Curated annotation (Swiss-Prot):
Domain of life: Eukaryota
InterPro entries: MFS, MFS_dom, MFS_trans_sf
Residues with attached carbohydrate: N181, N291, N545
Chief site of localization: membrane
Transmembrane segments: 31-51, 67-87, 97-117, 130-150, 159-179, 186-206, 225-245, 253-273, 297-317, 332-352, 360-380, 393-413, 425-445, 501-521
Protein name (Swiss-Prot/TrEMBL): Efflux pump FUS6
UniProt-annotated location(s): Membrane
Gene Ontology molecular function terms on file: transmembrane transporter activity
Gene null: resulting phenotype: Does not alter fusarin C production.
Membrane topology: Multi-pass membrane protein
Naturally occurring in which organism (per UniProt): Gibberella fujikuroi (strain CBS 195.34 / IMI 58289 / NRRL A-6831) (Bakanae and foot rot disease fungus)
């Protein structure tokens, strides 16, 4: 059990005066579990964006043109809203059972989507997938945190972050390839054998300890039902507003403003409720935000996730509308971010494990991202491949180092008993940031296009681009259709470039905000010992006592 001492982080010590022990060697069982967790993380990350390039084919086949947005949003909504719930339930029902349940739910959702014959079944399947995906993302981080010490977590977080980055970037390419060459249904069916292998491996090797949690009635009474309802309602309203804004309805319309205000008020009510004295186990306890380091790093994680999605959603606009790349080609053109963020994150994690120092990676990451976002403003129709590749490399290295270096110090500033809730909060805030990382630049882009559109001489083309139409028409097909009129094509591309320039400028402001926040993070000692009630059970032959902790039961 965590002691009061665990809750008080100590200042970072000099390595020369206090040498740290080498990390313990991991056996085959550990690596089998870690590979299985990484595979499920890859699948959950893959399904956040794999349908983006295949969506036109799916909607045409199912006849769901008017509801296409929900094929995307159902997954995002379900995964984000259920993350803190899985984190809390992991403390009550154990890590192993929740991990297996999450993988099973995700697999079921994949099967439903692959076999969908109408839009309702597809949206329902995506929602089921999202619940499982949110659980996988949460439980994978929690289980890894229970298997290694805080000091070692940076390295493994870097690997998982690399898996996520690679999946997010290759997903559109895979989706387009399946839709064009085989069938869009295999976008979902491919998950079944991979998830099945992971499920078997986790079932066989993921044997964890957990403390007694009482009777079924006692377990149910520990769940924060009120907080869960408020959080799900809040996320649902906010996602609705951000999905409708600028597309179905104008940002200034009541259809957008009302659900957005309701969602934000529900979020405020959720956090107020989390501080209620009668609440036994809050979904997201306020103590997670009670110290400067954890609260600052959670905000930094929000900004980092926002920026990652910001860039990954709007660079394809540049590639397709300005460089006239196909959707699949534009996805390939994003590879520099994935190919650099993954190794950079792993390298930063290894360094953190060896030295215990993490603040330098916060500063380094935001400096590199700031430089990259500033350089993005220089991109135009004549920019060489070397330019947009080089700028992405800077951003990829920066985003990889920040991702790896945020969770370990958050956990170091809190008692070990808060591992699950803190990890769940970190994962939720990252997902929540990704929602705004698409909505904010979209609003900025659409607003500037509306102001720049009068420069377009053709009124019919102008009408296609205003009020949110520019993002929808940022395609190779649309731009090439203007080729018979070179002057008009140049005008349209210039409007896109002006809108994108403002998008990059605003992203730079968020990078600088993240950099400033880095100064508020304290240097803490990353604990070398693993102190948890939910750790990996040691195989002890000829012994019925499978845990050194009295009262610990099999999960």
């Amino acid at each position: 059990m965590a002691s009061a001492k665990d809750a008080q982080p100590a200042p970072e010590k000099s390595l020369s005066s206090d040498p740290q022990p080498e990390p313990s060697k991991k056996g085959a069982r550990f690596w089998l579990i870690f590979v299985a967790i990484s595979l499920t993380t890859f699948l959950a990350a893959l399904d956040t964006s794999i349908i983006s390039t295949a969506l036109p084919t799916i909607t045409a086949d199912l006849g769901s043109e008017s509801l296409y947005v929900w094929i995307i949003d159902a997954y995002l909504l379900a995964s984000t809203a259920t993350i803190p719930i899985f984190a809390q339930a992991a403390n009550i029902y154990g890590r192993r059972s929740l991990t297996l349940i999450a993988v099973c739910i995700f697999t079921l959702g994949s099967g439903l989507c692959g076999g969908a014959h109408n839009t309702a079944m597809m949206v329902g399947g995506r929602a089921v997938q999202g619940i499982g995906g949110g659980g996988i993302l949460t439980m994978s981080e929690i289980v890894v945190c229970d298997m290694v010490s805080i000091r070692e977590r940076g390295m493994y977080a870097g690997i998982i972050g690399g898996v996520w980055a690679i999946a997010a970037v290759v997903a559109p390419v895979m989706g387009g390839a399946f839709a064009q060459n085989i069938s869009w249904r295999w976008i979902f069916y491919i998950n079944l054998p991979i998830a099945g292998v992971s499920l078997v491996a986790l079932g066989l090797f993921l044997k964890l300890s957990r403390p007694p949690s009482g009777t079924f009635k006692e377990q149910m009474s520990r769940i924060d039902w009120g907080g869960s309802v408020l959080l799900i309602g809040s996320v649902t309203s906010i996602v609705l507003a951000l999905s409708w804004g600028g597309s179905e309805h104008p940002w200034s319309g009541w259809q957008t403003i009302v659900p957005l205000v309701i969602g934000l008020l529900a979020l405020v009510a959720f956090f107020a409720y989390q501080g209620a004295p009668w609440l036994r186990e809050p979904t997201m306890p306020l103590r997670l935000f009670s110290n400067r380091t954890s609260s600052t790093l959670l905000v930094i994680s929000f900004i980092h996730s926002l920026l990652l999605y910001w860039i990954c959603y709007f660079l394809p606009v540049y590639f397709q509308a300005v460089k006239e790349a196909s959707p699949t080609r534009s996805a390939v053109m994003l590879f520099p971010i994935a190919c650099t963020s993954a190794p950079a994150g792993v390298a930063a994690g290894i360094t953190i494990t060896k030295t215990g120092k993490y603040r330098v990676w916060h500063f380094t990451g935001f400096v590199l991202m700031s430089i990259a976002c500033g350089l993005f403003t220089l991109l135009d129709a004549q920019s060489s491949t070397g330019r947009w590749v080089g700028f992405q490399i800077l951003f990829g290295v920066g985003t990889g180092t920040v991702f790896t270096s945020t969770l370990p110090p958050i956990l170091a500033s809190l008692p070990d008993s808060d591992v699950a809730t803190a990890t769940g909060a970190w994962t939720f805030i990252r997902n929540f940031g990704s929602i705004w990382g698409v909505a904010i630049p979209a609003a900025v882009f659409n607003n500037h296009v509306n102001h720049a559109a009068p420069k377009i001489s053709d009124s019919s083309v102008k009408s296609l681009l205003v009020d949110g139409g520019a993002y929808e028409h940022a395609t190779q097909h649309f731009i090439k259709s203007l080729s018979p009129n070179p002057d008009l094509k140049t005008q349209v591309i210039q409007v896109y470039l002006e809108g994108l320039k403002v998008v990059w400028q605003v992203s730079l402001a968020f990078c600088l905000l993240g950099f400033i926040l880095c100064f508020f993070v304290r240097s803490l000692t990353l604990r070398d010992e693993l102190n948890t009630e939910f750790g990996l059970k040691e195989e002890k032959p000829n012994s019925n006592n499978m845990s050194s902790e009295e009262g610990v039961v099999r999960d």
